[in-house]
Amino acid sequence: MTIQKNWQELIRPNKLQVVPGSDPSRFATLIAEPLERGFGQTLGNALRRILLSSLQGAAVQSVHIDGVLHEFSSIAGVREDVTDIVLNIKDIAIRMQGEGPKRMVVKKQGPGTVTAGDIQTVGDVVVLNPDLQICTLDDGAEIRMEFTVASGKGYVAAERNRPEDAPIGLIPVDSLYSPVRKVSYKVENTREGQILDYDKLTMTIETNGGVTPEDAVAFAARILQDQLNVFVNFEEPRKEVTTEIIPDLAFNPAFLKKVDELELSVRSANCLKNDNIVYIGDLVQKSEAEMLRTPNFGRKSLNEIKEVLAQMGLHLGMEVPGWPPENIDELAKRFEDHY
């Protein structure tokens, strides 16, 4: 028994079916079937854990609010206290290219509501949930906040985001870097041929818009694949590759293309067929006068064929040495990718 049979003879899904949700950039259901019995639970659980814990994303690390020394303060004219504001800031969804850290600023006067859409971003930082409410200002109130944004993975508690040399007034924020918000999966029986107990894995995924659900699963699968490589302690035997020797031709390989593959009108195609013109090599050797002597073949059909040939860099009245070759049907099959 060859070692490849350990994995080559297991059934695998033909493709991943993606069912978009109301917002395809955030919601989707992915279905993989058929899987060997037990593999649905194995893969579903592993992918779910990776999706929630290991994908890279961006989040707010800390915030500085003008006039505020610590998170247990209150701000005149602002209805929420600083603790509630910080909790709202934690929910800001961000997409960012590069590592960071980068800065964002919001400055607003009341009355009104400060939302994530009021934040002034720079460069490649994008706020994904602009409708998120951060705080509410009374008439005459003013607030200015500066955010530090960085990239990371998983969840990082606020205390770990506090630098050792943190200046007074810098408030660390819990950072939820993962772009995946929710993942659920279920495993059902599915049929393949006469076998009824294969697995069908259905995963429902919600992201913050920083990555599509389909891409999130692809990244998670790649992480899992990379982690498993260390357990493979052998190299697969290499397959012998036989290279087909293609003979040199004395003419353009395009001459081996059949005329019925050209986009011709029915009338023109029938005229060529009735005149036993099968290949382009047969056609280009004909002169205009010869073509016009073909029954039911008129000037309109002639112009059509001349135009099609011109698009291929060919014309009527060409000399084709060595035409027709003895094994023309075999050559046409071997050269079909060369014209």
From Swiss-Prot:
Species the sequence originates in: Nitrobacter winogradskyi (strain ATCC 25391 / DSM 10237 / CIP 104748 / NCIMB 11846 / Nb-255)
Free-text domain note: The N-terminal domain is essential for RNAP assembly and basal transcription, whereas the C-terminal domain is involved in interaction with transcriptional regulators and with upstream promoter elements.
Pfam families listed in its UniProt record: RNA_pol_A_bac, RNA_pol_A_CTD, RNA_pol_L
Family: Belongs to the RNA polymerase alpha chain family.
Function noted in UniProt: DNA-dependent RNA polymerase catalyzes the transcription of DNA into RNA using the four ribonucleoside triphosphates as substrates.
Presence of keyword Methyltransferase: no
A biological process term (GO) from this entry: DNA-templated transcription
Quaternary structure annotation from Swiss-Prot or TrEMBL: Homodimer. The RNAP catalytic core consists of 2 alpha, 1 beta, 1 beta' and 1 omega subunit. When a sigma factor is associated with the core the holoenzyme is formed, which can initiate transcription.
Region of interest (Alpha C-terminal domain (alpha-CTD)), ranges: 251-339
Region feature (Alpha N-terminal domain (alpha-NTD)): 1-235
Documented EC number(s): 2.7.7.6
GO MF annotation list: DNA binding; DNA-directed RNA polymerase activity; protein dimerization activity
Enzyme class: transferase
Reactions mediated catalytically: RNA(n) + a ribonucleoside 5'-triphosphate = RNA(n+1) + diphosphate
Keywords: DNA-directed RNA polymerase, Nucleotidyltransferase, Transcription, Transferase
Domain of life (superkingdom): Bacteria
SMART domains for this protein: RPOLD (SM00662)
Gene (name only): rpoA
Protein name, entry field: DNA-directed RNA polymerase subunit alpha
Gene Ontology CC entries for this record: cytoplasm; DNA-directed RNA polymerase complex
